[in-house]
């Protein structure tokens, strides 16, 4: 066993002595040592319950004849961090999480790992670590929360609260109505109830093969999640016995399948960023062109909040992620069904008995929302390395208008609230990319303000930053190269005409190459917003969004 490095041989007597101080007995040194990588944090509702959850995982690991050791990672609640400097720490926290898991696991020579993530950057951070460490691993997330209901019976979620602010600001609802939405938008523990980033990533974890069926959709408060814990411990033991590791599971074909699910269910645009980062950790050459190819062959079958009033509980009731996978598997060439997963079985075996139980929630291949995926990759002179739009969250397929430029999210939100944006405009928020932000903050506040003011179908928004999974409307993000790297978005001027063509996958500014070259020669990179601390280091090391915004290792040659 890998853990023999710290527990076998006369020279490891000091190590065993220290381990006995934690409560171990001599007989425990013949069992696998399992890292329980938890993320219990009281300020995050999706993680509030994970302390008790972790206890159940440890019990299940002991019952399977292994020895658990629990530790916790950090985490950032994107909703609470929204709209201030906290959002600059969100994406960078992914790297800290990956590094911290790598540090603890490799320093102590664990034989296997169970990861307990739930919310936005915690899940991809742990997934990156799992691929980097490459020991047998199973993920079991904390699960989504249920949707809420106002005193009038209206179904609401966190997206409703953000949009309620814009609605109140524009006089569409009263302060009492906003308070009612606030009080009921997040009714319990669990990841926010729509197809936002956290739930999108936990669903992708399931199809990638790192988590068990049900991981993405079973609610946090559902007793079936405890059964999932027991299965996770049992499956981990099998993975250890068969020496099946994350890099055996997460192949190029598995990532294809993850994006196939993503396109079918209309997941968050952040999945593109995080899955490209996973590919980097797995040593795979996977780019946005391949994502686009998947998008072209997979139909969009689900519209979940913020694209509709359906929520994760409805997806679960309708058959869960396995039902979506089973349906798209009917189309030839969409899924790679014979690859191994964390169950010890193939994807084909995992979904064999799945079926759609509500075709209003999960559409059939014969009745898709669209013939192509719910996410699209756009390119053009405004995004030479690519950009992402959640096409399933807007009915508008082509938009052209003059740009209204803001050089930060704060500037943009203030401008929107002051009425500087009108019907037909293209809002541009730049210098908010991985390097320029720094940290590539999410633009949920501006998109929610636009939607709440009733302009969701009449105003487009472009940014080199990110969008929350709760964002909707004509929102194009991840524009690469970013403004801080001298990308075309940095060269835009007030009133330039921008064209977004979702069907043709184009993002263009109606300015000649000669004029753009002239502007580029005159452009000067703004001074870095942050020069010290973690964000200062991050800004120096981070790569572009089109490569997952991972950190680059300096060349020491």
Swiss-Prot record:
Q: Spell out the Pfam families in the cross-references.
A: ILV_EDD_C, ILVD_EDD_N
Q: Which InterPro entries match?
A: Dihydro-acid_dehy_C, DihydroxyA_deHydtase, DiOHA_6PGluconate_deHydtase_CS, ILV_EDD_C, ILV_EDD_N, IlvD/EDD_N
**Cofactor(s) named in the record:** [2Fe-2S] cluster; Mg(2+)
* N6-carboxylysine PTM sites in chain numbering: 121
**Enzyme Commission number(s) of this protein:** 4.2.1.9
Task: Name its GO BP terms in alphabetical order.
Answer: isoleucine biosynthetic process; L-valine biosynthetic process
Q: Could you tell me which Gene3D superfamilies the record lists for this protein?
A: IlvD/EDD C-terminal domain-like
Kindly indicate whether the keyword Glycosyltransferase belongs to this entry.
no
Q: In its keyword annotation, does this UniProt entry include Magnesium?
A: yes
Could you list this entry's UniProt keywords, alphabetically sorted. Answer: 2Fe-2S, Amino-acid biosynthesis, Branched-chain amino acid biosynthesis, Iron, Iron-sulfur, Lyase, Magnesium, Metal-binding
Would you name any one GO CC term? cytosol
The entry marks the following residues as binding Mg(2+), namely 78, 120-121, 442
User: What does the entry's cofactor note say about binding and number?
Assistant: Binds 1 [2Fe-2S] cluster per subunit. This cluster acts as a Lewis acid cofactor.
A molecular function annotated in GO for this UniProt entry is: dihydroxy-acid dehydratase activity
Q: Which reaction does it catalyse?
A: (2R)-2,3-dihydroxy-3-methylbutanoate = 3-methyl-2-oxobutanoate + H2O; (2R,3R)-2,3-dihydroxy-3-methylpentanoate = (S)-3-methyl-2-oxopentanoate + H2O
Which amino acids does the record list as binding [2Fe-2S] cluster?
Answer: 119, 192
Superkingdom of the source? Bacteria
Q: Where is the active site?
A: 468 (proton acceptor)
Pathway assignment reads:
Amino-acid biosynthesis; L-isoleucine biosynthesis; L-isoleucine from 2-oxobutanoate: step 3/4; Amino-acid biosynthesis; L-valine biosynthesis; L-valine from pyruvate: step 3/4
Q: How does it assemble?
A: Homodimer.
What is the similarity comment for this entry? Belongs to the IlvD/Edd family.
Q: What does this protein do?
A: Functions in the biosynthesis of branched-chain amino acids. Catalyzes the dehydration of (2R,3R)-2,3-dihydroxy-3-methylpentanoate (2,3-dihydroxy-3-methylvalerate) into 2-oxo-3-methylpentanoate (2-oxo-3-methylvalerate) and of (2R)-2,3-dihydroxy-3-methylbutanoate (2,3-dihydroxyisovalerate) into 2-oxo-3-methylbutanoate (2-oxoisovalerate), the penultimate precursor to L-isoleucine and L-valine, respectively.
Q: What is this protein called?
A: Dihydroxy-acid dehydratase
Species whose genome carries this gene = Bacillus cereus (strain G9842)
């Amino acid at each position: 066993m890998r853990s023999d490095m710290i527990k076998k041989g006369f020279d490891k007597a000091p190590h065993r002595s220290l381990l006995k101080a934690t409560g171990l007995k001599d007989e425990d040194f013949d069992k696998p040592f399992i890292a329980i990588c938890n993320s219990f944090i009281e300020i995050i509702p999706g993680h509030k319950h994970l302390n008790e959850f972790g206890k159940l995982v440890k019990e299940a690991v002991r019952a399977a004849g292994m020895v658990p050791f629990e530790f916790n990672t950090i985490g950032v609640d994107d909703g609470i961090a929204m709209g201030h400097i906290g959002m600059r720490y969100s994406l960078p926290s992914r790297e800290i999480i990956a590094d911290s898991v790598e540090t603890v696991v490799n320093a102590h020579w664990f034989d296997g790992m169970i990861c307990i993530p739930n919310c936005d950057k915690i899940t991809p951070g742990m997934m990156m670590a799992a691929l980097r460490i490459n020991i047998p691993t199973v993920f079991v997330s904390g699960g989504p929360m249920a949707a809420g209901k106002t005193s009038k019976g209206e179904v609401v979620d966190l997206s409703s609260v953000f949009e309620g602010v814009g609605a109140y600001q524009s006089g569409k609802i009263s302060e009492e109505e906003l308070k009612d939405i606030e009080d009921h938008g997040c009714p319990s523990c669990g990841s926010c109830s729509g197809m936002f980033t956290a739930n999108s990533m936990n669903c992708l974890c399931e199809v990638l093969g790192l988590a068990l069926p049900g991981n993405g959709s079973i609610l946090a408060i559902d007793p079936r999640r405890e059964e999932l814990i027991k299965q996770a411990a049992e499956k981990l033991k099998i993975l250890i016995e068969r020496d099946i590791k994350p890099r055996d599971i997460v192949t190029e074909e598995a990532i294809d399948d993850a994006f196939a699910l993503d396109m079918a269910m209309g997941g968050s645009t952040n999945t593109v960023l995080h899955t490209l980062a996973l590919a980097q950790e797995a040593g795979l050459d996977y780019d946005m062109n391949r994502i686009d190819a998947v998008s072209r062959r997979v139909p969009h079958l689900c519209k979940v909040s913020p694209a509709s009033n359906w929520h994760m509980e409805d997806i679960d009731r309708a058959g869960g992620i396995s039902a979506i996978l089973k349906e798209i598997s009917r189309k030839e060439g969409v899924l790679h069904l014979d690859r191994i997963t964390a169950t010890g079985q193939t994807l084909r075996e995992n979904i064999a008995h799945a079926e759609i139980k509500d075709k209003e929630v999960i559409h059939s291949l014969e009745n898709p929302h669209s013939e192509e995926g719910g996410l699209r990759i756009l390119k053009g002179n405004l995004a030479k390395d690519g950009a992402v739009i959640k096409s399933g969250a807007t009915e508008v397929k082509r938009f052209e208008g003059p740009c209204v430029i803001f050089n930060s999210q704060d500037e943009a939100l203030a401008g929107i609230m002051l009425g500087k944006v009108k019907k037909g405009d293209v809002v541009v928020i730049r210098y908010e990319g991985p390097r320029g932000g720094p940290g590539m903050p999410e633009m949920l506040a501006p998109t929610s303000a636009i939607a709440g003011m009733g302009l969701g179908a009449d105003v487009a928004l472009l940014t080199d930053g990110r969008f929350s999974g709760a964002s909707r409307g004509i929102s194009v993000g991840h524009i690469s190269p970013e403004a801080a790297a001298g990308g075309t978005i940095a060269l835009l001027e007030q009133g330039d005409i921008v064209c977004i063509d979702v069907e043709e996958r184009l993002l263009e500014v109606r300015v000649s190459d000669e004029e753009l070259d002239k502007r580029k020669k005159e452009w000067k990179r703004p001074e870095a917003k942050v020069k010290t601390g973690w964000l200062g280091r991050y800004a120096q090391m981070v790569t572009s969004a089109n490569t997952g915004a991972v950190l680059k290792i300096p060349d020491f040659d």
